[in-house]
């Protein structure tokens, strides 16, 4: 009877210790909220910021982390989400206010950016493409200097508001 009691106590200690470890550890790709507020408009992008770590991220090579023409969740861990409190014009098309899953299909000279109506799905798995709301093709440009960590930001300019992925 004492052995069963010790085994149960040991099992409980291991379970509690594991739970505390996994809930309190720093994620490898830190979570970020990028926000834009102007007048009554509020836009928000929630994503995780992976590091390059001397890896080939995009390319046609077999060892690229994200091969050209393949789904990418725009970050790491959970799906990247885009949220607007107002109806907006996104790439020339009106979209309703709300929260969307945002993902990309990178290519060498352009990226296809898509908003999907299932924002709460885990990002590793490809989305249900039937739930895509809008897809736009945007030109891509090589950076002059390599960046270590993925970044999404808003840029307000004379042409309107741009969402920049670096």
Predicted regions and their residues:
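Hydrophobic membrane-insertion alpha-helices, especially the h-region
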Residues: 5-21
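Aromatic-capped interface at the extracytoplasmic side
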Residues: 18-34
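Charge-dense, helix-prone N-terminal extensions
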Residues: 26, 45, 89-90
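Short extracytoplasmic
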Residues: 38-64
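Low-complexity, acidic/polar, glycine-enriched regions of mature
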Residues: 55-59, 64-86, 101-102, 125-127
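Mid-length scaffold segments of soluble, non-membrane domains
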Residues: 74-121
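Surface-exposed, gly/pro-biased binding rims or lids
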Residues: 120-161
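Conserved small/polar residues in nucleotide/adenosyl-binding loops
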Residues: 165-166
């Amino acid at each position: 009877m004492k052995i069963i009691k010790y085994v149960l106590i040991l099992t409980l200690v291991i379970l509690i210790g594991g739970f505390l470890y996994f809930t309190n550890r720093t994620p490898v790709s830190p979570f970020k909220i990028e926000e834009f507020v102007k007048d009554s408009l509020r836009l928000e992008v929630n994503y995780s910021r992976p590091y390059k770590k001397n890896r080939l991220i995009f390319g046609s090579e077999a060892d690229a982390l994200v091969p050209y023409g393949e789904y990418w969740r725009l970050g790491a861990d959970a799906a990247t989400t885009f949220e607007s409190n107002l109806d907006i014009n996104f790439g020339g098309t009106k979209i309703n206010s709300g929260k969307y899953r945002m993902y990309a299909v990178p290519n060498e000279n352009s990226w296809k950016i898509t908003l999907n109506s299932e924002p709460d799905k885990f990002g590793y798995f490809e989305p249900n493409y039937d739930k895509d709301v809008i897809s736009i093709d945007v030109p891509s440009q090589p950076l002059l200097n390599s960046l270590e960590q993925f970044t999404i930001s808003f840029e307000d300019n004379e042409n309107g508001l741009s969402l920049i992925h670096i």
